[in-house]
């Protein structure tokens, strides 16, 4: 029995484990070393503790004695070399025994597979012994008793039953897991097909080839928002489809348009809601992500355009774009959460008269952004320009400029129409037959829309052109008229609204209006001045001797325009008396002043209130029973 033992002197160092043994393993070790817990008593434990203490004390004494007798350096080196030689000798012996065992097995196998066995034989064995010289036979084992055979069969049957039960449990668990997985996959793919049937584009994610994604963004948007328009369709544990929206915020956002008039919010656009019937469904989440991304891009482009329009009065803050329409009215645009109460209660809203205008502007900026996307698609389908080392600048979309042009043009058209109505109302109350015709937005010609593009794009192109409105008016004298063109352009300089007046005054052919007028007050003064000139010419023509046919008119004096640009006329009677008439026209009234002049007073510009014979008559808009202008002139012209 001693010869069968195998001792190996190279024992590995015992290292402390990083993790302690689990409790079941420790219990098994305790049972194997100390026996069952039933045999443990308090006396046996105390005896074991005392025995361990005595052993530790003995070991400490031995170590103390050994530490006192230190070896010198030479003895330590000799001892080290001896230990090294012993280790090498044991290693060589182990190697030789392993080679002998390998040669034995190889020689035994050479009887059946000589080629394979020859590769593992040593060179010495090949020389001294031929292949196949060693053979093995199976001998009958000693017979076993029936009890041993019966026990072996029982144990084998138990192991097989245990293995079958374990295999059955694993198969049942696998089947249950597979059934759940199939149900989850089926539900996932049903929802994916439902998304595809709704018309959404499905594709693989760029850097995740095994993950499907839905393209809900706009391919013609700027790269910042185009790359964010792709979301992953992931599967939850129960198979529900999860939309991984990435950088898109979870809360909805919308661009709000407000109208401020005289410092008070008088209009606010309605919050934009998604068209999905069920916002919690996968389609509702996709629509919300698409709408939110679109609204963020819209506000981003509004902010970009506002930065280049600072010279036109557009101001920007952290989350606000503001631009003026007139001196009293402003438009405010910001990006807000439509579900919060701050959507309406941010500032005091005391009126809702401009809600329709705010809604119209909100729809218009979204339509203009869609139009910009279509223009990007059109440019992308055309041949690219020549390569250049300079980076191509992405132009700002025209979103604010068309809105500002329309609002400013509408404001100036309404103002001009109101002004013309007031002035011509005064003239008609004075008995003067004249009229004007307004043609708003005469530049918009829907019959000339380009048929090669969709109707919506053609219609938008018409409103992106400079807006122009025309006012044609007749004057008092024959063949006298004027035309006012109001032109608004915010795309190319000169920016803003320009007034152009075309005048036809046969009595004053040298009078020409300025080419371009930028202020509506200046345009009003010029129009009023031209009408006043025509009134002076009409009075002069009415009282001229060539047209005095009746006896009554023959006894009247004639008026001659001395300073027509100041509205002054002069008459001289047969006896040498002089009278001066002054015509004063404003938006609200028409005033005629007549007074006597002596000597050099005919050259004076104003009539003093103490002038003898001062007569004044005023006409204002509205029905009146006063005599007409020509009747009054005829009355004051009597000699």
Curated annotation (Swiss-Prot):
Residues 160-187 form a coiled coil. InterPro entries: Mediator_Med17. It is found in: Nucleus. Pfam families: Med17. One of its GO terms (cellular component) is core mediator complex. One of its GO terms (molecular function) is transcription coregulator activity. It comes from the Eukaryota. GO terms for biological process: regulation of transcription by RNA polymerase II. Component of the Mediator complex, a coactivator involved in the regulated transcription of nearly all RNA polymerase II-dependent genes. Mediator functions as a bridge to convey information from gene-specific regulatory proteins to the basal RNA polymerase II transcription machinery. Mediator is recruited to promoters by direct interactions with regulatory proteins and serves as a scaffold for the assembly of a functional preinitiation complex with RNA polymerase II and the general transcription factors. Component of the Mediator complex. Belongs to the Mediator complex subunit 17 family. This is Mediator of RNA polymerase II transcription subunit 17. It comes from Aspergillus fumigatus (strain ATCC MYA-4609 / CBS 101355 / FGSC A1100 / Af293) (Neosartorya fumigata). The lineage of its organism: Eukaryota, Fungi, Dikarya, Ascomycota, Pezizomycotina.
């Amino acid at each position: 029995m001693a010869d069968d033992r195998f001792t190996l002197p190279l024992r590995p160092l015992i290292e402390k484990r990083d993790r302690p043994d689990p409790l079941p393993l420790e219990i098994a070790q305790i049972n194997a070393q100390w026996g069952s817990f039933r045999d443990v008593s308090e006396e046996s434990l105390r005896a074991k503790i005392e025995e361990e203490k005595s052993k530790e004390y003995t070991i400490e004494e031995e170590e103390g004695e050994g530490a006192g007798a230190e070896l010198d350096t030479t003895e330590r080196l000799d001892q080290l070399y001896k230990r090294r030689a012993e280790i090498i000798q044991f290693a060589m012996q182990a190697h030789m025994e392993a080679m002998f065992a390998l040669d034995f097995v190889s020689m035994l196998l050479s009887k059946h597979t000589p080629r394979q066995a020859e590769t593992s034989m040593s060179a010495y064995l090949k020389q001294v012994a031929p292949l196949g010289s060693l053979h093995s036979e199976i001998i009958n084992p000693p017979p076993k008793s029936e009890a041993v055979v019966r026990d072996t069969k029982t144990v084998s049957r138990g192991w097989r039953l245990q293995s079958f039960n374990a295999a059955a449990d694993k198969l049942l668990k696998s089947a249950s897991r597979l059934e759940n997985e199939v149900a989850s996959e089926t539900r996932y793919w049903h929802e994916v097909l439902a998304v595809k049937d709704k018309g959404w584009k499905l594709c693989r994610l760029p850097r995740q080839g095994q993950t499907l994604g839905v393209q809900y963004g706009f391919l013609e948007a700027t790269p910042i928002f185009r790359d964010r328009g792709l979301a992953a369709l992931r599967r939850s544990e129960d198979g529900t489809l999860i939309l991984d929206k990435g950088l898109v915020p979870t809360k909805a956002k919308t661009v709000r348009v407000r109208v401020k008039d005289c410092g008070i919010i008088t209009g606010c656009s309605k919050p934009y809601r998604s068209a999905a019937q069920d916002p919690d469904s996968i389609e509702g989440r996709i629509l919300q992500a698409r709408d939110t991304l679109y609204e963020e891009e819209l506000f981003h482009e509004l902010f970009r355009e506002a930065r280049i329009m600072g010279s036109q009065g557009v101001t920007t803050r952290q989350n606000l774009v503001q631009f003026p329409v007139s001196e009293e009215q402003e438009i405010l645009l910001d990006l807000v959460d439509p579900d919060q109460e701050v959507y309406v209660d941010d500032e005091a809203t005391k009126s809702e008269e401009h809600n329709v205008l705010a809604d119209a502007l909100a729809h218009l900026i979204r339509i203009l952004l869609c139009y910009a996307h279509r223009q990007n698609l059109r440019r992308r389908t055309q041949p690219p320009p020549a390569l250049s080392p300079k980076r191509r600048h992405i132009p700002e979309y025209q979103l604010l400029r068309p809105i500002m042009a329309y609002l400013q043009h509408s404001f100036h058209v309404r103002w001009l129409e109101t002004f013309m109505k007031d002035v011509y109302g005064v003239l008609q109350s004075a008995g003067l037959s004249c009229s004007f015709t307004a043609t708003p937005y005469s530049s918009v010609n829907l019959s000339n829309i380009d048929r090669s593009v969709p109707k919506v794009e053609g219609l938008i192109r018409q409103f992106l052109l400079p807006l122009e409105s025309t006012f044609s008016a007749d004057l008092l004298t024959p063949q006298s008229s004027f035309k006012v063109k109001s032109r608004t352009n915010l795309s190319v300089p000169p920016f803003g609204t320009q007034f152009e007046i075309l005048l036809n005054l046969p009595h004053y052919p040298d009078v020409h209006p300025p080419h371009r007028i930028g202020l509506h007050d200046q345009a009003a003064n010029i129009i009023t001045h031209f009408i006043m000139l025509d009134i002076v010419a009409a009075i002069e023509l009415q009282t001229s001797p060539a047209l005095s046919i009746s006896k009554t008119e023959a006894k009247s004096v004639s008026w001659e325009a001395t300073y027509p640009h100041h509205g002054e006329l002069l008459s001289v009677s047969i006896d040498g008396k002089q009278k001066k008439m002054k015509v004063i026209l404003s938006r609200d009234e028409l005033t005629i002043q007549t007074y006597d002049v002596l000597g050099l007073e005919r050259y004076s510009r104003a009539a003093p209130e103490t002038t003898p014979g001062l007569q004044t008559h005023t006409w204002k808009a509205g029905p009146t029973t006063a005599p007409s202008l020509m009747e009054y002139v005829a009355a004051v012209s009597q000699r």
